[in-house]
Amino acid sequence: MNSLLATPPVPPHFYEHVRLSPSRSMSSANSSGNRKRKAEDDNPSDHDTRMSASPSNSPALAPRPLPTARQIKRPRPNISGRPLPLSRLLETLDTDALRSVLRSMCNRHPELETEVVHTAPRPSVSSALQVLSNYESTLQSSFPLGGNSSSDYAYNRVRQHITNLLDALNDFTPHFLPPNESQVSTALSYLDGATEILHRLPRWDTPQHNLEKDVAYEEIAKAWIVVIREAGKRGGGIQLQYGGWDLKLSKHNQTAGGKLQDAINVLSSSLGWMGGHQDSSASQGGDPSSIRHQLLSGTYGSSSPLKVSKW
């Protein structure tokens, strides 16, 4: 019975051809063990941690401003003609055209005249003298070529331009007189330039034609007197002599043929306490006894030493 249950012997030729096929799990385990180990294999979550964390030494990046959206004008669906805006219209006007527009508006609406006067900037001495010089240039360019420039024919050619210049002079002069002009130096500067322009007006062969210029000299002399008296109230008139206005007015009087003598007399009385002389030769020589000469030379008070009283 035991012999029947015994395992039959295995023939020898079965042992020669037996091959053990390795399992897939063992080969993969051996191959993974033979590979070089990387840092990611030890701690796979460390890479994620380092990538999510901010570097401590990296500089902070300033936020970039977002670009503003450009406002693009859309084309009008229906284009049609329209007048210019006021700002564009004023850009096309030159000085003469703009002056004409303002003048016509003030004529039609007189209440605007006061508004324009208060809104416009105050004219300076240079701007006023420039206007007078423009009138003078127009006058000089109107003389006939050749012939006698002081004849009646030449006078008739330029008569209107002379009237325009003298009218402008009569309008500008009161503007620079006190009390409308508070600065004496500004008033004197204007009168100096206006008198120079008046000197350059032509003299005519016919004495009657010179009447307009002679009247203008009388008016400018009165203006000098007003300013000189106002300057005499401020600091005793020292500004007149310190600025050399005594010499300038004396020169104007000589050029005008003595027609500014009244202004010279008023100036002499205003500067009488200072020992000033209105004669040009004496003033240019520099009288050592005058207070002005002593102040400018630094010798004022040197001839009279200071007396010290006893205690």
Curated annotation (Swiss-Prot):
One of its GO terms (molecular function) is proteasome binding. The keyword Magnesium does not apply. Residues 21-32, 52-70 have a biased composition (Low complexity). It holds the Pfam family Cut8. Keywords: Cytoplasm, Nucleus, Protein transport, Transport. Residues 278-287, 296-311 have a biased composition (Polar residues). Residues 38-50 have a biased composition (Basic and acidic residues). It is found in: Cytoplasm; Nucleus. GO terms for cellular component: cytoplasm; nuclear membrane. InterPro entries: Cut8/Sts1_fam (IPR013868), Cut8/Sts1_sf (IPR038422). The keyword Protein transport applies. Gene3D superfamilies: Tethering factor for nuclear proteasome Cut8/Sts1. One of its GO terms (biological process) is protein transport. It comes from the Eukaryota. Belongs to the cut8/STS1 family. Involved in ubiquitin-mediated protein degradation. Regulatory factor in the ubiquitin/proteasome pathway that controls the turnover of proteasome substrates. Targets proteasomes to the nucleus and facilitates the degradation of nuclear proteins. Binds the proteasome. PANTHER family: FI02826P. This is Tethering factor for nuclear proteasome STS1.
